[in-house]
Amino acid sequence: MARRVVFLDIDGVLAPIRRWDRYGDLDPACIRVLNEIVAGAGAAVVVSSTWRHGKTVTELQEMLEAAGFIGCVIDKTPVGAPGADRGEEIAAWLAEHPVGGYVIIDDHADMGELRTRLVLTQPARGLQPADAPRAIEILKRAAG
């Protein structure tokens, strides 16, 4: 069976933005919810956040592990053409990598046709325990 994948944004998801003059720090409570999701669905993470710029997959894994993440970062989405939205970057990754199921966890809704797979977070709160069941349910749905 093909792998299940969480496309992960970081700002506004794992790093709540509580002040608009600076980005947030990784929140251990949000990381725990992510751990519940990846464990509950047997999923791996593909980083779709701007945090992927200038970092290797190994560096992203180490950064998340240092904050308590217990899962596996397997890749990061490609950087799209100028003006491309996140949904287009995720679609490009999916075109090259078959998956059994996927969910997008982001605080922006610019996912185009992929929005039925989106768990939208509130930027000031980040990923919440109430988001986990829906994310797991979406992950367990066949891709397509």
Task: Please state what every model-predicted region is.
Residues 1, 40-42, 134, 141-142:
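Residue-level detector of intrinsically disordered, flexible termini
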Residues 58-144:
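C-terminal cap/substrate-recognition subdomain and adjoining C-terminal extension
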Residues 1-3, 98-99:
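Alpha-helical hydrophobic/aromatic positions enriched in membrane-embedded helices and signal peptides
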Residues 2-83:
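Alpha-helical substrate-recognition element adjacent to the catalytic core
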